[in-house]
Amino acid sequence: MPSEKIDIEQFLITNELLSENGYNHYEISNYSKFKMECKHNLNYWELSPYLSFGPSSHSYDLKKRWWNVRSLKKYIKYLDKESLPVEGYETLSMKDNFNEIIMNGLRLSNGIKLSDLENYNNFIDKNKIDKVIRKWDCLDIVNNNIRIKNNGFLFVDEITKDLFF
């Protein structure tokens, strides 16, 4: 396995090369030409509801997440009995939803829309947000979005932890 130092060097080289050739770094692990972003991936990052089909697939409806059985044989047996092949689910709390907005939003170059946080006033500590922005000089607020700038994607996990409630 390459060392963390090599990973960082390769990330920076890749970022520079793709940027110089007209690619936009629109989310933590993806680049695209202008207006050619992957809508499928953005659907997940932007926390839009989705239904998935097949063994081990996960679905999400803004309030809960559920997943199907892993085994293809079991999946087929459920369908043969005209039953849903759901193995489990989790109901998402307000805290879970807030943290998912933070976690997913920071992975997008556009960042987190401050308007998306309006329903979570109980979890928002403006002093904490200001402190995190000061701590990480790769974070800023542009057009009412908290976003990662420059090579801040290298630190997104640590930044996310600092903002979690």
Language-model-detected regions and their locations in the chain:
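Generic structural signal of hydrophobic/aromatic residues within well-ordered alpha-helices
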Residues: 72-75, 102, 129, 133, ...
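C-terminal scaffold of the Radical SAM
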Residues: 1-121
